[in-house]
Amino acid sequence: MERMGLNEIREEYLKFFESKAHLRLPSFSLVPKNDKSLLLINAGMAPLKPYFTGLQVPPNKRVTTCQKCVRTGDIENVGKTSRHGTFFEMMGNFSFGDYFKKEIIPWAWEFITEILKLPKDKLYVTIYEDDDEALDIWVNKTDVDPKRIFRLGKEDNFWEHGLGPCGPCSEIHFDRGAGEVKTSEEFVKASDEDKIVEFWNLVFTQFDKDEEGNYNKLANPNIDTGMGLERMATIMQNVDTIFEVDTIKAVLDKVCELSGANYKEDRVKDISIRIITDHIRSITFMISDGILPSNEGRGYVLRRLLRRAARHGKTLGIKNTFLHNLTDIVIENCYKNYPELEEKREYIKKVIKLEEERFDETIDAGMQILNDYIKEVKNNNHKVLSGDKAFKLYDTYGFPVELTEEILEEEGISIDKEGFNKEMKEQRERARSAREETNYMGSEDTILNKIDLNINTDFEGYDKLEVKSKVAVIIKDEEFKNGMEKGNEGVIVTYNTPFYAEMGGQIGDTGIIYNDSFKAEVIDCKKNISGKVLHFVKILDGKVALEDQVILKVNEERRNNIRKNHTATHILHAALIKVVGDHVQQSGSYVDDERLRFDFSHFEAVSEDELKEVEKIVNKEIMKANAVNTKVMDIEEAKQQGAIALFDNKYKDDVRVVSVGDFSKELCGGTHVSNSGQIGMFKIISEAGVAAGIRRIEAVTAFKAMEYVDHKNNILKEAAQILKCNEKELLNKLNHQVLEMKEKEKEIEALKLKLASGAEDEILNNIREIKGVKVASAAVKDIDGNALRDLGDKIRDNMQSGVVVLGSNYKGKVLFVAMATKDTVAKGVHCGKIIKEVATIAGGGGGGRPDMAQAGGKDPNKLEDAIKTVETVVESLVK
């Protein structure tokens, strides 16, 4: 057995199965397409489910892939052990009703013994206890020693996940120190002790499990295999853990270099080193697939990984942001198989750095708060942190609850998760595990996706808005029907159509379907998972039946407006690259007949000057009346010509390229104007951030742009009338009014201070003494926080010894301040505790130091009640 690098193993595997007539497909995105059962792709076969279930026709009956995967179900074990990781690559070869056991078993043996040259006396095979067919093939079609084959039960060697396709499996294992194993019991024991490790699972999908629990034989059985690349690399490189594999160790070494720590010298530091090494791999690949840090879904998974890694960097003594620098090592070791990493290198680094900086801004304050909570819990001899406090750390300081749990676990403290989840409300969906579905293999198994794959629905709408066709499918009330009549709503599928189905951010067409005896309104148009065009209709008159001849007619005015907005989106994209920078990449868009929305990568607000320049460029290109051309070409040719591709899309070999003169060239399947001049006019109406590193521009075109400008002009005219000036004088008039208003506000504030000063004497005259401590408390009217603090300072200084607590109702909000002299603090007075109790009554909260604290409240009606509690609280604190 010769040592092989991880990248070499991957290439040898894919090449081997290409030689067996398999189509090599690139890894799919980590973001699942048309699969609500998963947050992230977590297995090699996951993106291929539509092929296994018959919802889509595979590009070839034999396929091989190396799929990037992320699993976070056992993230708490990552780092603590050297076996667990969140990111891994799964090599696989798949048969969709083509070859079966008699082919894959000899191929598997050939690959591991002749290509990888694994010693046969180190290999073991397991089969399902009843699978005599597999045993016969292993014994008679390979030269494996029959004594090294063991039958195991359903738990070990039968693959199923809920209902649907399932079947027995055969696993291949490597001996890592078990010695000779003679029985299945000895084999299981050695496996549990990691002395024998499984590295390849051959799944024979030959049954379909129904709701009654019956296993029905499939007419066309499938093959689904999975070999973990990193695990295979540990065997081929004779290392004990994935962290010692060549490409991963390169990252680990960089972590050690940045931190000054040495691996395998300190158990606690080793945990942090492994966590960072693993997480940066997941982080890099997730961002390359368009995922951005957020507080929900897969974005939350990313944020959790990133902040967990950043926190462990601080544990290692790394003071500055550092994760973005590790990305280079990940990319250098992976880009040949994942070229998108190199293409998006700078973007990935910017997203990571921005999120690190945001976490840096809050982590120190958050850790201080958490340490205070830990002390409080321990001082009270408790073992649980309340859910509301854990939520405050999450909401205010950006601490993922799992990070808080991890830190608390080190202190022997847990979280009140029920209380935390109650606080979370709308953010209940966590990243601990993917959403569960009963039917794993058929998560999109709706009636719309059961349309016969042999029915073709050709789109003719690029150059036609009206076509004749026949009705191929009718669906009503989630059932296939022979017909529909007036008043019914459902779905009609025809053999050809001019209707554009919603896709690529462009809304679906509307219009009518009719003949002499019926008429239906098309209210929406979408595609099912296999690409069939679905016309969502309401029958206005008559009846329609299968195979009826019909005419399909698109709403022309609406389609034309959509075309204008879609072409304008392309020009906008090119203009943004020109003005803002070539780092700009589309991360989403939405185009309908009213407006367009364009999301793009950028790390700060686009300035007013930049927006003006972008708008100017777009309108200039519109006025040039450039020809808009479309051409179908090879994907590589399109890229060579500089055509822009969407961030995370997978494209076929032949793609449609849309060009607007020499200014814009993009891969696009949408509908467009034939000449940029048809857009007429372009106007940006808003620019805002929608996520970390993502900005959004909304704009209108043609008559909608004119309406927008008219509306703005009318506002100017009305404002000029109110201020009794003409429009040219409006700015000067407004500036004058603002200056006057500021002067009046200063006068008002001065009067309020006078009133507050007048209240000072009254408060000093009403000082009470509690357990030897002077207490001054009062509610004062309508003064802001600064004035309230000034008044508190004066009263405290005047008292020389004591505590003062003041509250104010200012513009509908309640403000509190508490101050104490040093001698009263020594007696037990704590302003932070006083203010917290008092503010709670007014629906607020806050805290602070023993000698000074402030807070806010939500209910002005409770201000007097809150102030009345001051004496009771002080009495409870004074020793």
From Swiss-Prot:
Enzyme Commission no: 6.1.1.7
Name of a matching Pfam family: DHHA1
Main subcellular location of this protein, as a coarse class: cytoplasm
Superkingdom classification of source: Bacteria
InterPro entries on file: aa-tRNA-synth_II/BPL/LPL, Ala-tRNA-lgiase_IIc, Ala-tRNA-ligase_IIc_anticod-bd, Ala-tRNA-synth_IIc_core, Ala-tRNA-synth_IIc_N, Ala-tRNA_ligase, Ala_tRNA_ligase_euk/bac, DHHA1_dom
Localization per record: Cytoplasm
Cofactor note: Binds 1 zinc ion per subunit.
Catalytic reaction equation(s): tRNA(Ala) + L-alanine + ATP = L-alanyl-tRNA(Ala) + AMP + diphosphate
GO CC, alphabetical: cytosol
GO molecular function per UniProt: alanine-tRNA ligase activity; aminoacyl-tRNA deacylase activity; ATP binding; catalytic activity, acting on a protein; transferase activity; tRNA binding; zinc ion binding
Keywords: Aminoacyl-tRNA synthetase, ATP-binding, Cytoplasm, Ligase, Metal-binding, Nucleotide-binding, Protein biosynthesis, RNA-binding, tRNA-binding, Zinc
UniProt record similarity statement: Belongs to the class-II aminoacyl-tRNA synthetase family.
Domains (record comment): Consists of three domains; the N-terminal catalytic domain, the editing domain and the C-terminal C-Ala domain. The editing domain removes incorrectly charged amino acids, while the C-Ala domain, along with tRNA(Ala), serves as a bridge to cooperatively bring together the editing and aminoacylation centers thus stimulating deacylation of misacylated tRNAs.
Name assigned to this protein: Alanine--tRNA ligase
Organism taxonomic ancestry: Bacteria, Bacillati, Bacillota, Clostridia, Eubacteriales
